[in-house]
Every structure is written in structure tokens, then in C-alpha cells.
Amino acid sequence: MSWQAYVDDHLMCDIEGHEGHRLTAAAIVGHDGSVWAQSATFPQFKPEEMNGIMTDFNEPGHLAPTGLHLGGTKYMVIQGEAGAVIRGKKGSGGITIKKTGQALVFGIYEEPVTPGQCNMVVERLGDYLLEQGL
């Protein structure tokens, strides 16, 4: 399966039990910041934004004072899982980032999608990739 198929079929799909509700944007990005696959709506990010995200995975709490920035959008960092998941909130939407052995799985959402639904979609794919050694 291509990386684009993972984004299209496993991240940008309808939320289980909520037909028509889906993430706003999604991507799979290597630890080095190279985009493996992304939705057409995924924001163009700066290398320093990706560096900040990677630093927060290695040093949990790094982004808390400044917020998480992606594509020029600032998210307030909320409770995640140290070294494994970063979550951010902005207005009625937010972001979930799951770290795997080689990649970061991104999901961005707006209402009516809930934070929990975004977490479920992103973390399920991230956990699968981890099980596959990726």
C-alpha cells in the first residue's frame, strides 16, 4: 500500500459511525521533515516548525510555553503522551501528532469532529505502523 493510500484511506476517511465527518487535513512525515504523503489540505510547514515538534517528542514540554506551530497556525499544547503523542487545540479545532519509529502521523480537525475522534483516527494508524516496525 502506498503512503498516500494510508493518508486517504485511514486518515481522511469518514469517522466511524459519523458519515461525512472527517479530518480537515492529514499527513505522514518522516522524522527528518520529509513528507511521505499528505492530504491536499495539509498546510505547508517550515523546517523549524518540524524541528520544534521533534524536540518536544524528545524533551516533553518543550512546546508548552510557545505553543505548537504548523503552517503558521499556532496551537495551544494540551495533555498528550510524553514521547508518543502531542495534542494541540485552536478554537473549535486542533491537531494530534503520533510518533512512530520512523514517522510522524498528523491529523488536523475542526468541529463537528471531536478531539477524541481525531486522536482515535491518528493513533490507530500510528499504532499500526509501530506494529509493522515503521
Curated annotation (Swiss-Prot):
InterPro entries linked: PFN, PFN_euk, PFN_sf, Profilin_CS
Highest taxon in the source lineage: Eukaryota
GO molecular function, a single term: actin monomer binding
Compartments in which it is found: Cytoplasm, Cytoskeleton
Pfam families listed in its UniProt record: Profilin
PTM comment: Phosphorylated by MAP kinases.
Note: The variability of the residues taking part of IgE-binding epitopes might be responsible of the difference in cross-reactivity among olive pollen cultivars, and between distantly related pollen species, leading to a variable range of allergy reactions among atopic patients.
Assembly behavior: Occurs in many kinds of cells as a complex with monomeric actin in a 1:1 ratio.
Cited PANTHER family: PROFILIN (PTHR11604), PROFILIN-5 (PTHR11604:SF25)
Name the record gives this protein: Profilin-2
Species name: Olea europaea (Common olive)
